[in-house]
Design a protein with these regions (language model features):
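Arg/Lys-rich, positively charged N-terminal/basic patches that mediate binding to nucleic acids
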Residues: 1-35, 39
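Enriched for short, Lys/Arg-rich terminal
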Residues: 69-109
């Protein structure tokens, strides 16, 4: 399967990269991108690896999730299967009230 990255997913990853760049420096920020991409490629090979999120909102109902590879395994990638592709929808740190956060625009407080 091929991987498509939605605009919100790209914005989430860029925002997290910028956070690591500011807080921890270039080396850590640059190291963040490899595990994210490796996780996307793993899901392309094994699309059913991530379980469904169990969300009730219609937009999120079919979304699946999977943890980013170590050492960034506090980050969750949300995706869905669509027309033979994996569509990466969001990327964020695991936290409470995920359904609400997933429906917000990237960077919303």
């Amino acid at each position: 399967m091929s991987v498509r990255k939605a605009d919100d997913f790209i914005a989430d990853v860029e925002r997290q990269f910028d956070w690591y760049l500011t807080k921890a420096g270039w080396e850590v920020a640059d190291c963040y991108l490899d595990p994210v991409e490796a996780t996307c490629q793993l899901l392309a090979q094994h699309p059913n690896l991530g379980p469904r999120g169990g969300f009730t909102h219609p937009r999120l109902r079919e979304w699946r999730f999977f943890l980013v590879s170590r050492p960034f395994n506090q980050h969750i990638l949300f995706y869905e299967l669509a027309r033979g592709d994996i569509v990466m929808r969001r990327a964020m740190r695991g936290q409470r009230d995920l359904p609400r956060r997933l429906l917000e625009l990237p960077g919303a407080q």
